[in-house]
């Protein structure tokens, strides 16, 4: 497994909005981690995203 070099959490008020920003992130090298979370307090959807060190050779 490659080392995570960057990590962020995307959030949006709708699933459709989250889908748009997650797909935009994927197009520039971000990868989703796990599933989508929803906060009943903020009424937002969340997706963890990471970039990995692709230069590491883990044999």
Language model segments and positions:
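Terminus-proximal functional modules
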Residues: 1-59
